[in-house]
UniProtKB/Swiss-Prot annotation:
It comes from Novosphingobium aromaticivorans (strain ATCC 700278 / DSM 12444 / CCUG 56034 / CIP 105152 / NBRC 16084 / F199). Part of the ABC transporter complex CcmAB involved in the biogenesis of c-type cytochromes; once thought to export heme, this seems not to be the case, but its exact role is uncertain. Responsible for energy coupling to the transport system. It is found in: Cell inner membrane. Residues 6-189 form the ABC transporter domain. InterPro entries: AAA+_ATPase, ABC_transporter-like_ATP-bd, ABC_transptr_haem_export_CcmA, P-loop_NTPase. It catalyses: heme b(in) + ATP + H2O = heme b(out) + ADP + phosphate + H(+). This is Cytochrome c biogenesis ATP-binding export protein CcmA. The gene is ccmA. Keywords: ATP-binding, Cell inner membrane, Cell membrane, Cytochrome c-type biogenesis, Membrane, Nucleotide-binding, Translocase, Transport. Belongs to the ABC transporter superfamily. CcmA exporter (TC 3.A.1.107) family. It is a peripheral membrane protein. Its main location: membrane.
């Protein structure tokens, strides 16, 4: 697996006149899982978007090493296409494997994405990330909408990715059942 990781230094995020967090630093290396923890609205999603380079921090810097795959509230799969075709779009771009079976999607490949349930959509998004070949995964609330079985399977896939030399940053208000996880509480960086 290619080199991966990121270093965020003294990050601050502002929304309107409100500072969500400040002086947040984070160093993520290959093999690591970092849990960005906190209540809804505290700034976890904004931090994920800053780490991905989609949102400019109010202050601070982010250095990224290696390719990044992002899963957030935007599904990034064409809702009008059958799931198989929507996933193939990303396969053509990323030239990576197709982990549909790992996420229990084999029986859904002919179903248009717009007809998938919330949990099925979340599993499809995780399959897209896993198939990307990117060593660094940024996951915003990846377990939302998943039942206990698929939550466990998703966390197993995350641990397996890190065991192969990848790194994962997870923003979640839910507790995680991961063995090797470092938790960063966003509330510790509020003004």
């Amino acid at each position: 697996m290619q080199e991966c990781g990121l270093v965020a230094t003294d990050i601050a995020c502002r929304r309107g006149d409100r500072i969500l967090f400040r002086a947040l630093s984070l160093d993520v290396k290959a093999g690591e899982i970092v849990h960005l923890a906190g209540a809804n609205g505290i700034g976890k999603s904004s931090l994920i978007r800053i780490l991905a380079g989609l949102l400019r921090p109010f202050a601070g810097t982010v250095e990224r090493r290696g390719a990044i795959a992002l899963s957030d509230e935007r599904l990034a799969l064409d809702g009008h296409l059958p799931l198989e075709d929507a996933l193939r779009f990303w396969d053509r771009i990323d030239r990576a494997g197709r982990p549909e079976a790992e996420f229990g999607l084999d029986d859904l490949l002919d179903v248009p994405v717009r007809y998938l349930s919330t949990g099925q959509r979340k599993r499809a998004a995780l399959a897209r990330v896993a198939a990307s070949g990117a060593p660094l995964w940024l996951l915003d609330e990846p377990l939302n909408g998943l039942d206990v079985h698929w939550s466990e399977r998703a966390q197993e896939a995350i641990e397996a990715h890190c065991a192969r030399g990848g790194a994962v940053v997870i923003a979640s208000h839910q507790p995680l059942a991961l063995e090797r996880v470092r938790t960063l509480a966003i509330r510790n960086f509020q003004p």
